[in-house]
């Protein structure tokens, strides 16, 4: 560990970078060295390996045409399964329990339509009031399709402070009328990590199925879905996994549920040996592949080939270790350098935080615009939230130090005041 009189100096940050075991991976990403990108929790950066994977798949189309489904470097017909196998270690699952398919929301629709089986008193779904809106839209939609009023049958656990959830409150809502629970692994605003193992155990003790949205944890923190006995999970791949805008999502189904018929069946739900028999009676795949629906979006799945290779080399434990150091260092600097400017850190201070920080300020929208003008890329969340995500694979401690200096300059010089305090179309 570097030894300096003050952790607040640039030299201290540079020494942290000098002993960073993941430093070499930064060179694999396309990075504008004149800017500081801290929005990897919304969209990760492009790596040269992800780029090459996409080019390889394009080349297969060019060379083989229709035969690209079974020929070439990465045959398309098996990509969802082969990438599921590569991603399984990130979630602590067996290869056959993970499939790369669809989008986050379509996968949630698929899983709820497959696992929500109201019977008797059990007619309600338990969620939370801090979840990402799309999940709530999907849950309400599924209740409508089953003939239930979401106002009555969707129970949302309340937050005491608008930032964090109390697991005791969640467990208290696991009542006899709950048939299914869907929760985030990491809250998208505050970055709080929920105790998935504890919640899963509590749910199963009450005969309730439970699934998790891993969008803000996949590629950032380790998971043990099999060990925790989670029933299902789903996630995107364009944030920390660096799959690119609109990259194909993924899902996990615990093997104990293999054989459960998919609620939304389609062409790719089929057992691959039977798929081209063209029978009108579906023979589902015998693994998580049964929960696919349509043809995979090959060009949106291809970058994951290269991206997941980086994760295999870096290791999710090392990524998490550096991530905690980056965010801890950033919090230390915020508290020291910005104490005069009314910022409030709203994410957990302990290791129950994900890979981003969430700070609040009444002028947050304007401050984010001022940061972008200074080539620091943050993320605004209405009404007054700023998310800062130093990514372990490509951000540096020096960038963290520079960011806080830029933020201090913006506040001291009131550079934010020339902007309107409102979000852009894409925040």
UniProtKB/Swiss-Prot annotation:
UniProt EC number: 3.7.1.3
Binding positions for pyridoxal 5'-phosphate per the UniProt entry: 104-105, 132-135, 213, 216, 238, 267, 295
Involved pathway(s): Amino-acid degradation; L-kynurenine degradation; L-alanine and anthranilate from L-kynurenine: step 1/1; Cofactor biosynthesis; NAD(+) biosynthesis; quinolinate from L-kynurenine: step 2/3
Gene3D superfamilies assigned to the protein according to its UniProt record, in alphabetical order: Aspartate Aminotransferase, domain 1, Type I PLP-dependent aspartate aminotransferase-like (Major domain)
Family assignment from sequence similarity: Belongs to the kynureninase family.
Stored NCBIfam families: kynureninase
Name this polypeptide is given: Kynureninase
Originating organism: Shouchella clausii (strain KSM-K16)
Recorded name of the encoding gene: kynU
């Amino acid at each position: 560990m570097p030894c300096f009189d003050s952790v607040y100096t640039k030299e201290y940050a540079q020494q942290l970078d000098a002993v960073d075991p993941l430093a070499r991976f930064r060179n694999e990403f396309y990075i504008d060295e004149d800017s500081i990108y801290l929005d990897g929790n919304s969209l990760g950066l492009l790596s040269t390996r992800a780029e090459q994977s996409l080019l390889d798949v394009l080349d297969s189309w060019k060379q083989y045409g229709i035969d690209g489904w079974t020929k070439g470097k990465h045959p398309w017909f098996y990509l969802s399964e082969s990438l599921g196998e590569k991603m399984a270690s990130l979630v602590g699952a067996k290869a056959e329990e993970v499939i790369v398919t669809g989008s986050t929301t379509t996968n949630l629709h698929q899983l709820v339509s497959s696992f929500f089986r109201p019977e008797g008193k059990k007619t309600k779904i338990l969620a939370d009031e801090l979840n990402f809106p799309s999940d709530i839209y999907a849950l309400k939609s599924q209740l409508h399709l089953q003939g239930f009023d979401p106002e009555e049958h969707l129970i949302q656990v309340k937050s005491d402070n608008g930032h964090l959830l109390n697991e005791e409150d969640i467990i208290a809502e696991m009542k006899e009328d709950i048939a299914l629970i869907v929760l985030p692994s990491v809250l998208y605003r505050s970055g709080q990590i929920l105790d998935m193992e504890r919640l899963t155990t509590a749910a199963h003790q009450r005969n309730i199925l439970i699934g998790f949205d891993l969008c803000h944890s996949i590629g950032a923190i380790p998971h043990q879905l099999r060990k925790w006995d989670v029933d299902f999970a789903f996630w995107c791949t364009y944030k920390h996994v660096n799959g690119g805008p609109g990259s194909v999502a993924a899902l996990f189904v615990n093997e104990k549920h293999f054989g459960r018929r998919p609620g939304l069946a389609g062409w790719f739900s089929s057992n691959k040996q039977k798929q081209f028999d063209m029978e009108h009676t579906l023979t589902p795949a015998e693994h998580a592949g049964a929960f696919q629906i349509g043809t995979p979006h090959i060009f949106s799945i291809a970058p994951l080939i290269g991206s997941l290779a980086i994760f295999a080399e870096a290791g999710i434990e090392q990524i998490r270790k550096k991530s905690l150091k980056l965010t801890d260092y950033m919090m230390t600097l915020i508290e020291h350098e910005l104490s005069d400017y009314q910022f409030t850190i709203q994410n957990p201070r302990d290791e129950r935080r994900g890979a981003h920080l969430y700070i609040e300020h009444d002028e947050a929208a304007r401050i984010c615009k001022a940061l972008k003008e200074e080539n620091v890329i943050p993320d605004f969340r209405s009404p007054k939230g700023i998310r800062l995500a130093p990514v372990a694979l490509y951000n540096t401690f020096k960038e963290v130090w520079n960011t806080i200096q830029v933020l201090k300059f913006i506040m001291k010089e009131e550079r934010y005041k020339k902007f309107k305090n409102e979000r852009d179309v894409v925040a």
